[in-house]
Amino acid sequence: MPVKQQIGIVISNKMQKTIVVKIENRYPHPMYSKTLIKTKKYLAHDELGECNIGDQVLVEECRPLSKRKRWKLIKILSKSSLIN
């Protein structure tokens, strides 16, 4: 089974070694063809704690690391221009 990878935006980094990533999925409505956006939030493992809010990241599915954490950070695609 291939490993699933997704691109998302970091919306929280308040926890130790954990980030919350928002992933948007766009798809057309089957009848009306309007583009709909479905948003999901995933907890991802950030071992070094290098992500900030607003960063665009690549996450990969992995074995369960805790009750809700099943994704890990692969790399930061672009840094946020927000200053913390």
UniProtKB/Swiss-Prot annotation:
One term under GO cellular component: chloroplast
Protein's UniProt keywords contain Aminoacyl-tRNA synthetase: no
Subcellular location: Plastid, Chloroplast
InterPro entries attached to this UniProt entry: NA-bd_OB-fold, Ribosomal_uS17, Ribosomal_uS17_bact/chlr, Ribosomal_uS17_CS
Family statement drawn from the similarity comment of this UniProt entry: Belongs to the universal ribosomal protein uS17 family.
Subunit structure: Part of the 30S ribosomal subunit.
Record function comment: One of the primary rRNA binding proteins, it binds specifically to the 5'-end of 16S ribosomal RNA.
Stated name of the protein: Small ribosomal subunit protein uS17c
Protein species of origin: Phaeodactylum tricornutum (strain CCAP 1055/1)
